[in-house]
Amino acid sequence: AWPAHEQYLRMATATPTKVVFLGMNPGPFGMVQTGVPFGEVAAVKGWIGINAPIGKPPREHPKRPVEGLACSRSEVSGRRLWGLFADRFGSAPAFFEDHLVANFCPLAFMEEGGRNRTPDKLPASEAKPLLAACDQYLFETVRILRPDWLVAVGGFAEARAISALAGLEVRIG
């Protein structure tokens, strides 16, 4: 999904930015399909205006195929989040003037049965190095974008932000 993610980053990285909204990690019917955090297909294509090709990964879970922008399943949290921004800002360019939506962890994990496994549910031996790398990624993202606020979408994202961003001048809520 790199072409779509690159398009997203190019439109969403004003510096400094006022607010970064932070989720946990890609959902199977959102960013996994579209390359956009909380990437509800209708919002990505219609409101954000991204229509890039989405390739398949070398290894794909048979119960969670990557269909890209043709995915018919809905990312409910993404529909709500991008719907809120559409109502509040009207247009994607107006939103992206000083806002960004990101994920703490850019990776998706699927259990054997196809269920999404979030980073907080990984075994400690796997989670420790992953969380350290994601903490550094978040720190660098916030250092570069210099937002006034980081709005965490969920308790896990908030806890990681508080831990990772110690020493930076950013309000976390």
Give, region by region, the residue ranges found by the protein language model.
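A polyanion-binding, active-site-adjacent surface
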Residues: 1-149, 158-159
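Flexible loop residues that form catalytic
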Residues: 155
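Distinct, well-ordered alpha-helical segments
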Residues: 162-164
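Short, flexible loop segments at boundaries between secondary-structure elements
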Residues: 166-173
